[in-house]
Every structure is written in C-alpha cells, then in structure tokens.
C-alpha cells in the first residue's frame, strides 16, 4: 500500500527518508533506515571533496540500497557535488537559489537531483530546473531553517504548483503524520528528530534524553546558534532548554570540545555543532536541534522498529479513512 512515486523513483520500499543530519546520521543509522526499507541521507557541510569521498565510500560499503547526499548551498563546492553524484542515488540542495546548472551536473553524473524548498516560488523554480523530486520543509522541522511557512499549507500549495514527487518534512514522527502527508498527495516524508533518539544515531546520550523529555512548546525557532556559520544561514529550531543553558555561559566560554577524527575542536557559545558521543563539556548548552515532533518522541528505540511501527500505523490509518 505504501509504494509511491518516491519509492519507485529512488528504489526503496517505504516512503520514509532519513534527514541529512551530518555527524548524527552515522553509517549505522543510515544502514538501519535502509534495512527497514527507507532511504538514508547524509551531509557534510564544509568538508572537502576528498573527505566526502572517503566518507561516502565507507557508507556505500555498509549501507545496502539507495542513499543520498545533501549540499548546503553556502558551502557549495562543485567537486563535492561531483563526488557525491558519482556515489549516491540522490543529491539534493538546500538554502540557496535554485540553479539549473547544478541539476544538470548531478544528472550528468547519473544521480537524481532534488531541492529542499520552503516556498511555492522555489518549488516552481526547482521543478522548472529539472529536479526529479522536491522536499517541502515547514518551520516545524528541527535544525537550520530557510523560510517561514508551516508544513501543511505550504505542502498543499506546492502540490498544486508542481508535477514532480514531493517529500514532506517538518514535524512528522509517527504513522499518522506519514498517512496525513500521503493523503494530502505527498510521495513520502523526511524525518530527522525521531531518528536522533535511536541507539544507532551519533547523538550524545544527553541529547537523546533531552528529546525524549521534550513536550509541546519545548522547541523554539531562534537565530542564536549561528556562531562560525555563514551569515546567510540565520534561523534554526532547537530545544528551548539549549538556548536557556547557553545564555547562562560567559560570552567567551568554550561550550564543549568535540573529537572529529584526529582533531579536537572547541565549540564556542552558541556554536553550530550538535553534541555527538565524542563531545565533552556543557552538553545541555550545545545546539540541540529538534523539531516540534520532539513532543511525540517518548522512547529511545532502534530505527528499524520505528519505521516498522510507522508503516503499520500509516497503513492502518489510511485503511480507516479510506476503506476498500
């Protein structure tokens, strides 16, 4: 029942896509999502092509099925685009003007091209540029934000405006959300926050626990977590507690130290780096990216179990409102 234009296009079994969450979306999490029938995404903003190639080769060796790579436009590196397109089923772009040349570049390497959009105008531009699929993201979503519309009105408007598969993102964490998106006409959903709270994710245990504890109203759209980030990327949705804890630190504080391979980096107050298992310091004051769907997360559980339950819920919900 849940085969859609998205699953047919990318070659997965269920219309659930893992959001590209950088170091949080570990190869283990990506592999688990794909084993459950979904499609994993990753992203490495600012990383050079050689590092991206090594990381994607490692992912390809451990992840069965199609996976994709997200490019954040202020960090655009054409060599990275080529590297990802040669290794991934999908390369999608976010936080910048739609460029036909990038879509053509991805296609030339044999990959599908996508664009994450936050307005109807961007959706039309992406479809006109030849994108194979779009991700429509509402302000309910966690992490970096570009746009100001909530998901459901935006999704409806985009579906009326374009004729390519559309994936809905922002505030979705269960089978009802998936069913609602499919019933509205979307071809799938992209989820991030729900998968942070999994054993496979790279999130620090305190980060996972904070999401599980979060309730309605416990996230906030803020421009605080932007230190050492391009000026064009302003807002992000995080747990409200992260803003409160960070505000208590001195302006020159080192919030945490995070090991990244052979290096250890200092994370400043309101720095953009989220806490991974390799972080030490004021974890509660780091960028705890989370969408409004955090209120629906009450347990840390394996990604495969999450997807299986979401699919069952969605199928049951769709049958209940559209009986045969």
Predicted region positions:
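Active-site entrance/lid segments in N-terminal catalytic domains of soluble metabolic enzymes
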Residues: 1-165
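Conserved active-site-proximal phosphate/metal-binding subdomains
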Residues: 141, 149-167, 173-324
